[in-house]
């Protein structure tokens, strides 16, 4: 796995914040989910903000079902709260089964019904949703980021996400000692900003 040095990591964050104007939706979504924590309909609205902006390419082919999203939150709230209290450094093998179950259920809850697209589910939507719910613990990926780390999530996406999370724990442990990075976001979000700049957009 490639480990950026401090200069490259900070440059990736800087370029992300220079060019990525949609990040305001991240602030809105995290605020809504936090403010309405435990109110499942409102929490699903907060997740919808991030999904319909950050993954709009997927949802142009079908509608996000907010009722299914609300049911997922209600049925899995205990596990969601469990991971919300933790950070990526505590990720361990004992978490695999719970994370796999959350991932697979959320894959259905964030899916679409559409005749216009071959893909009815989005592992990208799952990762973004999990991160908004548990921003210190769950990492974010997209197609380019996942492939850059060696993962093609078209098959066994939940297993690939577990392996990706393990890799990002290792990366976080390597870069946590770097100086000068912003403290306004969780480290796992800063890593996503770097990944997005490098692997998705090629800004660095």
Model regions and ranges:
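An N-terminal alpha-helical hairpin/helix-loop-helix interaction module that forms a charged
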Residues: 1-117, 135-204
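Short hydrophobic alpha-helical segments that form membrane-spanning helices or hydrophobic packing faces
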Residues: 125-132
